[in-house]
Amino acid sequence: MRMSDGAAPKANGSEASGQDLVPAAVEQAVPIQPVAGAALAAPAAGQINQIDPWIFQNFVQCPLGEFSISPRNTPGEILFDLALGPGLNPYLAHLSAMYTGWVGNMEVQLVLAGNAFTAGKVVVALVPPYFPKGSLTTAQITCFPHVMCDVRTLEPIQLPLLDVRRVLWHATQDQEESMRLVCMLYTPLRTNSPGDESFVVSGRLLSKPAADFNFVYLTPPIERTIYRMVDLPVIQPRLCTHARWPAPVYGLLVDPSLPSNPQWQNGRVHVDGTLLGTTPISGSWVSCFAAEAAYKFQSGTGEVATFTLIEQDGSAYVPGDRAAPLGYPDFSGQLEIEVQTETTKTGDKLKVTTFEMILGPTTNADQAPYQGRVFASVTAAASLDLVDGRVRAVPRSIYGFQDTIPEYNDGLLVPLAPPIGPFLPGEVLLRFRTYMRQIDTADAAAEAIDCALPQEFVSWFASNAFTVQSEALLLRYRNTLTGQLLFECKLYNEGYIALSYSGSGPLTFPTDGIFEVVSWVPRLYQLASVGSLATGRMLKQ
């Protein structure tokens, strides 16, 4: 073995077996042409930016570049506030995952869908980094580089978005402050229409990288989480299940006369999949509960059942961050429940017993589902000889229904899901309605009960866990038979749908349509109003 470079090679060793295969006289250098662009790429240590020229030449809509203006907006209200960066362009946002940093300017194009019958101005300004934008007024924003835009402008307005920075390049993963494009309503929106009908002017923001925009430093391939674009199940509301009562959805409506901020505990879910209150994932759990039952006959009352609650999957219920086990009824009244019971009577081993259970809002039965204990009773002249054991109670009918939260902890405080809301002025909650079986000697109509989302939507969001990119999703509801667009609405991240409706009475929509996802929009996005002929013509597509 050779121990040093100075050691003489052995004549018959393994290292000498490959020597002198080519005579020295025949050896010559093989000419190699230089790689094209090697000199240009050398200072960047192999970091070559490959942005397609088409991306530099064409404007595309920004991911959050959709906004609207209506007479409800007040001067000084910010319509959009977007930062310079790859996130301003869908192509650059996709490419930025491969690079460590970016640098350079961008160009934006503002398109307003105005008409000759409206008047108003918006101001678009470039706000430098680290400037507090929360206190901007209409007077202060004109101190920055800005452009005044009339809503009657037909041609797109093009603006440069300069990269003002204090670093050599921006890291794609850091929230480094950069130049921001802020659009503010400068003067109120007015119309010469004799009526007071609400109207909306829509706007779009498009972007493209400037010629000096560039990415720097390729990142090594790493395992990343794949984020799905938010979508909705393609299912008509009439085929969905109600989220607060085990029945199909029979109606879709808005009604300004009903409470605008109900505090329902079932049918509540965030767009990111976070369940609120006592909302279950399975529709078979709605308004039901499981328990260990103990029966006792009381003279003058009948058979009294004491239910020690458990979760409906059989696991133990632990009081904590919700008011009751999952699926427990979230309304008040006298509920009739059916329980599969076992008796000691000969020839009557199994039977279905109907108990009456007072849910609230206040009771004398000391109902405390938060602590895992509720009571129910059935009128009987003698003991029913029921056998204690595990049961599952399902609702049958309701008497004295009240759409308020039941008694959860014998009058004491419990953790509750927050009320639904807030809404912008003119917005009304979209309600999914079904009807409960009711026992009443005076009113023969079934009792209506509403929910914020169908149970299929709740299960969809809970199982997909979408990534939230803004404060609301712009949706459109389309009739599947005629193809007509019935209304547009916003699905807020908190899990409720809002419409713009100026009427005073209820407005019902057909349940054979489907919801379509349009884009992410800010909370202040103004919706086109429904319920008027002119607006209906405007929404048709």
From Swiss-Prot:
Residues 225-541 are annotated as: Protruding domain. It is found in: Virion; Host cytoplasm. It comes from the Viruses. Residues 278-416 are annotated as: P2 sub-domain. GO terms for cellular component: host cell cytoplasm; virion component. The keyword Magnesium does not apply. It holds the Pfam family Calici_coat_C. It comes from Norovirus (isolate Mouse/NoV/United States/MNV1/2002/GV). The lineage of its organism: Viruses, Riboviria, Orthornavirae, Pisuviricota, Pisoniviricetes. Residues 417-541 are annotated as: P1 sub-domain 2. Residues 1-224 are annotated as: Shell domain. Homodimer. Homomultimer. Interacts with the minor capsid protein VP2. Interacts (via P2 subdomain) with host receptor CD300LF (via N-terminus); this interaction requires Mg(2+) and Ca(2+), and allows viral binding and entry into the host cell. Stochioimetry is 2:2. Bile acids interact with the P domain dimer interface and act as cofactors enhancing virus binding and infectivity. Interacts with host receptor CD300LD; this interaction allows viral binding and entry into the host cell. Residues 298-366 are annotated as: Interaction with host receptor CD300LF. Residues 225-277 are annotated as: P1 sub-domain 1. InterPro entries: Calicivirus_coat (IPR004005), Calicivirus_coat_C (IPR013643), Rhv-like (IPR033703), Viral_coat (IPR029053). Belongs to the caliciviridae capsid protein family. The keyword Lyase does not apply. This is Capsid protein VP1. The shell domain (S domain) contains elements essential for the formation of the icosahedron. The Protruding domain (P domain) is divided into sub-domains P1 and P2. P domain interacts in dimeric contacts that increase the stability of the capsid and form the protrusions on the virion. An hypervariable region in P2 is thought to play an important role in receptor binding and immune reactivity. Capsid protein self assembles to form an icosahedral capsid with a T=3 symmetry, about 38 nm in diameter, and consisting of 180 capsid proteins. A smaller form of capsid with a diameter of 23 nm might be capsid proteins assembled as icosahedron with T=1 symmetry. The capsid encapsulates the genomic RNA and is decorated with VP2 proteins. Mediates virion attachment to the host cell receptor CD300LF. Keywords: Host cytoplasm, Virion. CDD domains: rhv_like. Gene3D superfamilies: 2.60.120.20, Positive stranded ssRNA viruses.
